[in-house]
Amino acid sequence: MTQDELKALVAQAAADYVKQEVPEGAVLGVGTGSTANLFIDAVAAFKDRFAGAVSSSEASTRRLQQHGFKVLDLNEVDDIPVYVDGADEIDASGAMIKGGGGALTREKIVASVAGRFVCIADGSKLVETMGAFPLPVEVIPMARAAVARQVAALGGQPRLRMNKDGGIYKTDNGNVILDVSGLKITDPRGLEQSINQIPGVVTVGLFALRGANVLLLGTGEGVQRTDY
């Protein structure tokens, strides 16, 4: 199966999961990225079961609205039973690197409110040690050079994310992203805390302190479920 076929497989599995596990009338948490987009497409078939959705990005909000979902502001919501999102890498503990799509801060906020985080990914995303995928760090623009120096002191090689047109990439929050390569992440929780404490960092794309509760992994043999 191709990577796209595996993504579609886990997206449908996640739609089946929320149909079974999320009570009618509840609010659904929705992530960002190519796999999350396929989940939105799949879950739209029974969108009327839900009171609405909280989205982690402007892009996901647009896609949800195109399908007729009511998109709610997180400040209006007290409870999100399940948040569904992809990952750039995930390890055996359920810790993840996220933020390749630039929505790491809002993803982390919505995930922190959710009762369960369901990660959907193809088999290539499950790794023994994270760090091959560059670690995104969202940074206040005025602090980008200072943060880059401190991240380099931790052993990383930070690079400012750029748009295809050569301009500096900006998040939905108006900040910049440093993509940090060269890290072998053997202590995800410790590194998440260390980077988050650097002044000027909004958040790092390590989801270890609040990792996944369920992994739906697309493989050639079908969808494998892991509970953490």
From Swiss-Prot:
Gene3D superfamilies: 3.30.70.260, 3.40.50.1360
Catalytic-site annotation from UniProt: E107
Keyword hit for Lipoprotein: no
Keywords: Isomerase
Pathway: Carbohydrate degradation; pentose phosphate pathway; D-ribose 5-phosphate from D-ribulose 5-phosphate (non-oxidative stage): step 1/1
GO CC, one annotated term: cytosol
CDD domains the record matches: RPI_A (cd01398)
Binding site for substrate: T32, G33, S34, T35, D85, G86, A87, D88, K98, G99, G100, G101, K125
GO process annotations (BP): D-ribose metabolic process; pentose-phosphate shunt, non-oxidative branch
Catalytic reaction equation(s): aldehydo-D-ribose 5-phosphate = D-ribulose 5-phosphate
Enzyme class, UniProt record, top EC level: isomerase
Gene Ontology molecular function terms on file: ribose-5-phosphate isomerase activity
Enzyme Commission numbers on file: 5.3.1.6
Keyword Signal: no
Family: Belongs to the ribose 5-phosphate isomerase family.
Subunit and interaction comment: Homodimer.
Function noted in UniProt: Catalyzes the reversible conversion of ribose-5-phosphate to ribulose 5-phosphate.
Protein's name in the database: Ribose-5-phosphate isomerase A
Gene name tied to this protein: rpiA
